[in-house]
Amino acid sequence: DYKTMPLDDAFKIKKEDYFTKNGGIIFPNPNAPTGELMSVEDIDEIISHNPDSVVVIDEAYIDFGGKTVLPLLKKYDNLLVIHTFSKFRSLAGSRLGVALGNEELISHLYDVKNSFNSYPIDALAQVIGEASIQDSDVIKEHAKKIVATRERTKKSLKEMGFTMTDSYSNFIFVHHDDFDAEYIFKELRKKHIIVRYFNAPRINQYLRVTIGNDEEMDAFLDAVKEIIQAS
């Protein structure tokens, strides 16, 4: 059994929700689809309240401006940090990821893995993964460009009246008080621009916009401006 914990009114994780007895904790940081980031200090406090539980932090989007909790691995044996090669390294097709934690904790993960999935990572994925690590400086520069484009896009959308969460990811989560999110989504689709619309409580007036290159984001911003001005 598991229990999901609601975010607060600002779509942030409430650290106090994780101070009670539990069988384990897992959450993404930065979060999805909001992009909100919890501080290392707050995560440290959560772990300190849970000495008998494994705390798993999914840092899939951490390289787009966030501060990693990896230094806390020296402090806590019950912390597990997971990274993917799908986002920052743009290798979704390789199905590569890493789990970092205490040696004993990792050995237990191997026991579980081998009980239902004994398939190793294929040779091609290993070569690709190793090459991407060796090319980390180039990939970091690419991530910096994404962050710069993200901030420029946020600024332009704010000038059009949009509000948004404080995203530390390669996407932004936006809302407009005067325009229905589903309407904007459908109008953008007519222009062959796809964003993510969530028909779900609390977030059905938000759109998640993935950050592309400057040319793609300029086309997106121009399209949004046309939709707003025509309404």
Stretch-by-stretch model annotation:
Residues 3-8, 83, 198-199:
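Short beta->alpha connector loops at strand-helix junctions that form conserved
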Residues 78-158, 162-165:
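PLP-dependent aminotransferase class I/II
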Residues 147, 159-191, 207:
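Conserved PLP-binding catalytic core of the aspartate aminotransferase-like
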Residues 12, 93, 168, 202-205:
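Short acidic/glycine-enriched loop/turn segments that link adjacent beta-strands
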Residues 7-63:
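Active-site phosphate-binding strand-loop segment of PLP-dependent enzymes
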Residues 41, 187-191, 196, 200-231:
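PLP-dependent enzyme catalytic core of the Aspartate aminotransferase-like
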Residues 101, 174-178, 211-213:
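Short beta-strand-to-loop capping motifs
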